[in-house]
Amino acid sequence: MVLNDAVIGVPYTIRDIQTDDVELDAFLRRLGCYSGQSVVVVSRNRKGCVASILNNRYSIDADIASAIII
């Protein structure tokens, strides 16, 4: 399941980040988005979702959210 498919308000554990883009992978790691970390989708809109990672909220577009496997 990818982050786009997550139910709002339910905590999930990140299993993997599937991207060939080294810069995107490094960026997500700096945000605390890596395997084993907890993530909760707070809200969703047409362009993506707002996710809580390490007690911080981030607006994540749909393309990036589809690379986050939960």
Question: Where in the sequence are the language-model features?
Answer:
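A structural micro-motif recognizing beta-strand termini
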Residues: I17-T19, R30
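Short alpha-helix capping/helix-loop boundary micro-motifs
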Residues: E23-F27
